[in-house]
Each structure stands twice: as C-alpha cells, then as structure tokens.
Amino acid sequence: AVIGDFAFDPRYQGAGSSMVNSTKVDSIKDMLETSGISVTGIVRGYQRDGKEDEAMKKEAVDLARRSDVVLFFFGLNEKSETEGLDRKHLRIPQNQINLIQELAKANANMIGIISAGSVIEMPWHHHFKALLHTALTGQAGAGAVLDILSGKVNPSGKLAETYIKKYEDTPSYNYYPSQERNSEYREGIYVGYRYFDTAGVPVNYPFGYGLSYTTFEYDNLRVKIGRAHV
C-alpha cells in the first residue's frame, strides 16, 4: 500500500521567492504506474493543510489492513517551511501523527518516507521498520526514491543535522524565537552536535547518521604515523 499526500504531490522545493515553475514534476503515483511494481492501492490518507478527515483516515487504515507492507509518505508542507517566518515547534502536523498511530495498529510492516527541509521531532519513529529521509527531492526525485525503495540503488546519505528527541532539549529553547527586535545567539561554539555530544543529551539520530543495505565490517586496521598525530 502507498499512503500519503506527498506520494501524489511531492514536496520538491521550498516556498516563497525560492519557488520555481518546473517543466515537469515526477510523483510517486505516476512513477508507480510505469515501474512494474504492484501495489494494493494508493490513497492520500490525510489533508496536507493539517485538517482532520476521518473518511480519508478510514480509507487509509482499511488499505493498510489488507496490505503486506505500507509505504507512508509524510512530512512538512510548504507553509511550514517558508521565508519570512520562524517555526514555532518541530512537530509534523497532528493529523499525520494520528494517522501513523492508526496505521501502526493495522499493519506492523510500515516504512516511512519523510519530506522535510529541516529537523522534526519523531516520537512516533518506533512505529516504522525503516525511515527514508528524502528532504526536498527536486522535480525528478520520485524516481530516485523508488530506486532506493526497490533496492535498485543502495542508500548512502548521511544526516546533516542532529535529529533531537524534543525541541526542549536544544540549548536555544528558552530564548528562541526572540520576543523582542533582536535574536540572541548564546550557544557560542556549542551549535548542533557539539552541544549534544558535550552535554551528553540523548538524541533520536545523531549528526552524520545514515544506514544502507550493506553490512560493513573492519578488521586488522593499522595506522602508520609519520608527521601526523592520531
């Protein structure tokens, strides 16, 4: 089963003045029709603007219940990440969280495909057997995503940010965003992973994290020291 609004209309670029008029945008829905991959069905499951829709939720859960595997496409919409405003929290829309919980009850074999341009809280990540973070894919990203999901390509990306457990864990939580004219940057050198590593704050996924379909093993490592120091 393929579930999620982003499978129909991919989040492939930013919003505001960064938006461009693409000559063509590939979607998972369209790519599946020519891929030869058989699916039990494809539905949106939720409204992109965050509104609850019980009929869409029920349709998605029913589809998940009669499927072997669920590919759930979700994340942040264009209005969540745009110029001229600061995000007030790091959560995905609540209607998507609610659907994740219901889908997990219907089918334990769920794979999440995330579309987001920045860090999100992930208290629901244990519901997924695997997570693929696609960021903003560009106009031809759907084909690349299918290549990874089908095993044609081995994923090799690494996180460029630390995915924290909750916003309150960040050192800037108490004074950002600013309530006055000026924003205060008090972290000093302890920005991102430097803070979490130094303070020993647990995170969901650390900076540089990323898995592939390959298992690596190193042995008999040797270091030849010349002028360098290890």
Protein language model annotation of sequence segments:
Residues 1-229:
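C-terminal non-catalytic regions of proteins with extracellular/luminal or membrane-system context
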